Structure formats: structure tokens, C-alpha cells
Amino acid sequence: MAAVQAPGEKINIQAGETTQVGDTDQQRNDWPEEDRLPERSWRQKCASYVLALRPWSFSASLTPVALGSALAYRSQGVLDPRLLLGCAVAVLAVHGAGNLVNTYYDFSKGIDHKKSDDRTLVDRILEPQDVVRFGVFLYTLGCVCAAYLYYLSTLKLEHLALIYFGGLSGSFLYTGGIGFKYVALGDLVILITFGPLAVMFAYAVQVGSLAIFPLVYAIPLALSTEAILHSNNTRDMESDREAGIVTLAILIGPTLSYILYNTLLFLPYLIFTILATHCSISLALPLLTSPMAFSLERQFRSQAFNKLPQRTAKLNLLLGLFYVFGIILAPAGSLPRL
């Protein structure tokens, strides 16, 4: 005779047991703590999203925008605060989205682990789908800002689109798609994207045209920005090698990585010394940050890589700001094209 199922009961055919409907919820509550994300307040969630962006690295975006705007002001006498703000938000959005893409693909490929600097997904601070959605939002925000810049600026659409989408593609393809980072081309992508390209973008939207000389002025800043990435890749050399990826630091080894880091660190100071000697003494302002550079060199030499990328980013920010101030304070006509 068929068994009668009481209301609120489920029959477990395999086990031959009867389970109350409420038992399922009870079982979920009995899951191991590590398998369930703890309940967090909205403030904690917002903090998690902000930390996932790696805000300490944003100097690599802000200083090129400031430099390009300063070059526009000194060469053409134009500086629209609306364009400056829109450009800064657009570049920061693309940079932040690129960091999230990096987090997602490094986790997907098994590169990030419990000892990694970025443990956003490893420690389940955010879920992969959260990172993807946030990245899409930031790329969308960047495109909205680019449209806003086109509305305000006299720069041709094709020129604005070429620079902006060139930077956007670089930020995504660094680890997404082709994954330039994994085939030792990431340094080149970052050197171009967060150096000449970002400076040119900020300059062009202000003056409404392209020029070559902003690319030249971007060189010291680009070298300093590359030092951030190289210190990061040198720190992660062993874990990257175990994961089967190839970075420039892995290709050249520890000794040449140390030499390259010093070159990226100190070559900008040589450039500033030449400019201060032959053009304007105001370009000596960035030399005030040289004690920080020597401190970073000692830290790299002793292989104390903890927080080295963050400290290098701090130097990059101060170096860039003093560089911008030096250009603004230089007498008219003392610098080439300014």
C-alpha cells in the first residue's frame, strides 16, 4: 500500500528517511563557516569594493592626467576644470576596471593564493561575479565620461576614441583576452597606457588637438610608473613561475631585475637634473623625492619586497606632483614648446 506523505515532509527515497522541509534550512546553517560568507554591513561591502580597486596604485592614473593638463595650460593657456575632472574620472574608471580584470583572471588561472598581495577572491572578500559586475560598471562609467568629454571638448571624435579605447583595450588585455602579462609583454602595455597615452589624452581633450611633445614630457613619469609594476612582478616571481606564466622579471632574473628597477627609479632624476640645468631650476623640485628613491633601492636590494609596490607608488605620486608644479612654475619660454 502506498505510503501517505504528511504535509511539510519530503521522502528521501535512497535513504528511506523522511525529512522535514525545515531541515534543509537547518542543514544550510550547519555548513562549515568557511563555506559561507559572513553577513556584512553596507559599509563593509563598500570598503571591500574600494579595496578591490587597489587605490594605492591610482597615482599611475592621476599624475599623467595632471601632467597632460599642466602641459595644455602652459602651451595653450587653456584649462577647463570640467574637462580635467571628466578626464580624471574616465582614466580612474578604466584603471580600476583593469585592476578588477587582473584580480579575476589571476584568480581564475590559480595565480593568486593565500600569501598573495591581492586576496580579494582568495579570501572571498568578494565573489567572482561581484568583481565582474563591478568591472563592467567601471568600464561603462569610463565610456560615459568619454562621451561627456567629446561633448565638451573640440577634439575630433576619431582622435578621442583612438586614445580612449586604446587605453581601455590595454587595461583589459593586460590580463584578459590575450593576457599580455602572462607572456612578458605586460610591462610594455603599462609603460604605454599609463604614460604617454594618458598624458596625451589629458592634453588633447583640453586643447582639442594632438601633439608630439606631450609624449616626450611623459617619459620620466612613465619610467616611474613602470617601476611600480616591475617591483610587483619581482616580488611575485616565484609564484608566477609556479603558475606557469612568464613576466619580464622572470625572463631576466633577480640580478637584472634589480638593475632594471634602479634604472626605472633613478633615470627620471637624471632627466630632471638636465632639465633643471639647461631649462628651468623649477624642474629640480622632483629631486626632493630622491631620498625616498634611495630607500626603495635599499629595500629592493635586501629583497624585502613587502609593501614595495605600494611605497614605489607613493614615490610615483610625489614625483609626479613635483614634476607638475615644476612645469607650472617654469618661466614662459624656458621649456621646449612651453
Swiss-Prot record:
GO terms for cellular component: cytoplasm; endoplasmic reticulum; endoplasmic reticulum membrane; Golgi membrane; membrane; mitochondrial membrane; nucleus
Pathway the protein takes part in: Quinol/quinone metabolism; menaquinone biosynthesis; Cofactor biosynthesis; ubiquinone biosynthesis
Top-level taxon of the source organism: Eukaryota
Membrane-topology annotation of the record: Multi-pass membrane protein
Name of the top EC class for this enzyme: transferase
Record field: compositional bias (Basic and acidic residues): 25-39
Keyword Transmembrane helix among UniProt keywords: yes
GO terms under biological process: circulatory system development; endothelial cell development; menaquinone biosynthetic process; menaquinone metabolic process; phylloquinone metabolic process; ubiquinone biosynthetic process; vitamin K biosynthetic process
Record's catalysed reaction(s): menadiol + (2E,6E,10E)-geranylgeranyl diphosphate = menaquinol-4 + diphosphate; all-trans-decaprenyl diphosphate + 4-hydroxybenzoate = 4-hydroxy-3-(all-trans-decaprenyl)benzoate + diphosphate
Key word Mitochondrion present: yes
Subunit organization: Interacts with HMGCR and SOAT1.
Protein name as catalogued: UbiA prenyltransferase domain-containing protein 1
Source organism: Rattus norvegicus
Name of the gene this protein is made from: Ubiad1
